[in-house]
Amino acid sequence: MREIADRAAAEAERQAIRLALQATQGNKSQAARLLRVDYKTLHLKMKHYGIEAAEFRMS
């Protein structure tokens, strides 16, 4: 049961990061503020989940 809860929490966290980056067009500093986490924490979580800020930047 704990494993299921951990997976659900990780997926929710990953989705929140993606939504924040989408809302800020890939600006990590703004996304960190939006999520109320330290910039370094966001950077480490992005690396953990394989999320690149460039995916969310407008060309």
What does each model-identified segment do?
Residues M1-S59:
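Bacterial C-terminal helix-turn-helix
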